[in-house]
């Protein structure tokens, strides 16, 4: 059952506090710090670098943007380079923060819809694998490479940062990730993962890309239900997704409710 608007607003407040303002690092080598009026993550190598949360107004926004550009811009290539993301949420302030980021040289990527659902509701979904499909939990590099193969077939792109992040989590913090493949015999046709942080009320669902010839058969739904059952066994109350335009309708039919819209603003070291 989808949450009503009052409950969604309460969950959004909890999400902002727990996953943004008081965020935990997303890996053993990452560092989250509050500096000035923002919370940011910095990590060497191919990890995710960026601004998670901000408390800005018309008088403070431009100076804080400049401070973050200076911080990340000072990083050498050996540290991962200057590129970073300012993850903007539709309820962030000031209202023109996106315009200010663009004026500072950030490039917006496609927006996604932040959706959330109760884990218990999704764990109870009556889902059976489509004929010919089995699930395989990923625990090693060979499995991660199969996931990257699926991603390339589904989207036509390579994701070296995601590969490195998954390998690091599986090696250093295996309890924080659940990665799974949908297999047609020996061929991977879909892949997804769930990331969890100790003590967090939210588990994040990522991936779910499916090879074109296998779409529309319920595999995405199957992968959501599998991860929900894992999260339920760990007493994590909510599942969260940054949903693309393609996945949002599926997720809403499963009972996810909308918390807002997120837009990644990317700084690549120079103005466009």
Task: Annotate the PLM regions.
Residues 1-21, 52-56, 112-114, 121-169, ...:
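Short amphipathic alpha-helix that is part of the acyltransferase structural core
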Residues 31-35, 93-107, 177-192:
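Conserved beta-hairpin
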Residues 1-79, 93-94:
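N-terminal charged segments
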Residues 42-52, 109, 196-205, 215:
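A conserved beta-turn-beta hairpin within the catalytic core of GNAT-like acetyltransferases
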Residues 59-142, 241, 263-267:
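Acyl-donor-binding surface of acyltransferase catalytic domains
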Residues 158-213:
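A conserved beta-strand-loop-helix scaffold within acyl/acetyltransferase catalytic domains
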Residues 101, 251, 256:
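Conserved active-site tyrosine of GNAT-family acetyltransferases
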Residues 61-69, 207-212, 216-229, 233, ...:
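Conserved acetyl-CoA-binding loop-helix of GNAT-fold acetyltransferases
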């Amino acid at each position: 059952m989808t949450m009503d608007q009052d409950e969604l607003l309460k969950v959004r407040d909890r999400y902002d506090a727990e996953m943004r303002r008081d965020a935990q690092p997303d890996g053993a080598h990452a560092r989250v710090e509050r500096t000035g009026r923002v919370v940011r993550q910095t990590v060497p190598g191919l990890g995710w670098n960026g601004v998670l949360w901000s408390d800005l107004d018309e008088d403070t926004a431009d100076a804080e943007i400049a401070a973050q550009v200076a911080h990340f811009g000072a990083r050498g290539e050996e540290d991962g380079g200057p590129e970073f993301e300012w993850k903007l949420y539709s309820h962030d302030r000031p209202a023109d923060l996106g315009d200010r980021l663009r004026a500072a040289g950030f490039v917006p990527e496609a927006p996604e819809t932040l959706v959330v659902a109760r884990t218990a509701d999704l764990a109870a979904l009556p889902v059976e694998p489509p004929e010919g499909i089995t699930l395989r939990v990923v625990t090693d590099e060979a499995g991660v490479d199969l996931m990257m193969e699926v991603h390339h077939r589904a989207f036509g792109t390579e994701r070296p940062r995601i590969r490195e992040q998954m390998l690091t989590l599986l090696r250093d913090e295996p309890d924080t990730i659940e990665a799974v493949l949908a297999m047609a015999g020996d061929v991977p046709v879909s892949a997804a993962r769930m990331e969890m942080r100790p003590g967090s009320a939210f588990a994040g669902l990522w991936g779910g890309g499916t090879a074109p010839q296998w779409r529309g058969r319920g595999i995405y739904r199957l992968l959501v239900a599998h991860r929900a059952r894992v999260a339920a066994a760990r007493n994590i109350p909510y599942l969260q997704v940054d949903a693309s335009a393609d996945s949002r309708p599926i997720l809403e039919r499963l009972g996810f409710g909308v918390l807002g819209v997120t837009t990644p603003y990317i700084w690549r070291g120079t103005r466009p």
